[in-house]
Amino acid sequence: MNTPEDSSLGREVAYPSGYDPSLLFPIPRAAGRAAIGLRGALPFVGRDRWHAYELSWLDAHGKPCVATATLHVPCESPALIESKSLKLYLNSLNATRFNSAEAVRARIATDLSTRAGADVSVEFGLPPIDAVGEGESIDALDIAIDDYGPPKADYLATHAGTVVEEVLASALLKSNCPVTGQPDWASVTLRYRGAPIDREGLLRYLVSFRDHADFHEQCVERIFQDLLVRCAPQWLVVEARYTRRGGLDINPVRTSPQMPTPLSIFRDLRQ
């Protein structure tokens, strides 16, 4: 079984001189899910949306082409794709000739699907930037915080009263790469229907990820699971938009299966 320590993270790696799909490094999702008590049927559906800003190849005549792309990896896939390996893989296309842009798109989709173990969709272009931001920010709450990890679900609570349907947001999520320790920065949005979630407790909970080491996808699944267990919403959506590194950013979204409408697809200004 592949582990994060076996990947190219934190190592000096020669950039590939030619197309090489073996560079893609899948990491099984099962271990991260077992750590938060998920061993059977998943309580969510969703995807990991990647934005690729540095994509290039050669056309049939050897002239360079450039593009951006959006990749959708379903959360039902047995494996996630380690980010540095995806960067190296995309760079392996730089000196490779293709007859058309569609051939490039299809090749990337096929290679990612093979390594993730499920159908990965690829489309050229990026979502628009959300200049306003969805939801009501909780970041201006005037509270003292001195707990930066490990993540503490005990902070999560609800208020008795009328059922609400609302969208809350924070730009203060920070976690760390589990191999290199590099900081990962994100905005997180949660949409739910249920008893009102205590906002001070929610902010303390999100800040408690600050010293936590885990992959982006696993952080979002932990947030979803903790909110589901502690706050028992009728339905829930959690999305994190992580800032760019190595020409890529990752945007995991997890939703209750009965969620009526998905969150709109946007990028953050910080991305």
Curated annotation (Swiss-Prot):
InterPro entries: GTP-CH-I_C/QueF (IPR043133), NADPH_dep_7-cyano-7-deazaG_red (IPR050084), QueF (IPR029500), QueF_N (IPR029139), QueF_type2 (IPR016428). One of its GO terms (molecular function) is preQ1 synthase activity. It is found in: Cytoplasm. It is an enzyme of class 1 (oxidoreductase). Substrate binds at residues 81-83, 216-217. The keyword Oxidoreductase applies. It holds the Pfam family QueF_N. GO terms for biological process: queuosine biosynthetic process; tRNA modification. Its EC number is 1.7.1.13. The keyword NADP applies. The active site is at 177 (thioimide intermediate), 184 (proton donor). Pathway: tRNA modification; tRNA-queuosine biosynthesis. Homodimer. HAMAP family: QueF_type2. Belongs to the GTP cyclohydrolase I family. QueF type 2 subfamily. This is NADPH-dependent 7-cyano-7-deazaguanine reductase. It comes from Xanthomonas campestris pv. campestris (strain ATCC 33913 / DSM 3586 / NCPPB 528 / LMG 568 / P 25).
